């Protein structure tokens, strides 16, 4: 079997950032999958399940309610390796096109107060596995260390 594209990225040199993982054509529309990489794979700890689950709920809610981007959001969810998220948008986009959106989303997560959307037994299959206080710390760290003043090396996959 051939390696899928995401397994050809050198995870030993990959930095936290926002990367175009792939582009696919569906009918006449291009959809872009973004790799929102929050930790340096195999060099930093992965995100705990409670925090990544909370971020999934907050991020999906934020994106699907965004005044400018809601109609382009197809999917937002965690990577199985727990080092970040995939975000799929309608359109032929580049990483630089979504820096503002991703920064807004992580600011929303870092500053969120109140009940986590969908954190109820009726709404979620694992609603008890949430941790808002630590989620806010993880989101703020990504904002401060990666998204603020983001550079090209955090927007384009390494060779």
Name these PLM-found stretches.
Residues 76-149:
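Active-site-adjacent, His/Asp/Glu-enriched structural segments that form or flank metal-binding
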Residues 66-70:
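Short secondary-structure junctions
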Residues 146-158:
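Low-complexity, highly charged intrinsically disordered N-terminal segments
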Residues 31-65, 75-76:
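Active/ligand-binding-proximal structured segments within catalytic/core domains
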Residues 1-42, 156-159:
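Non-catalytic terminal extensions that flank enzyme cores
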Residues 18-20, 73-78:
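Generic structural motif
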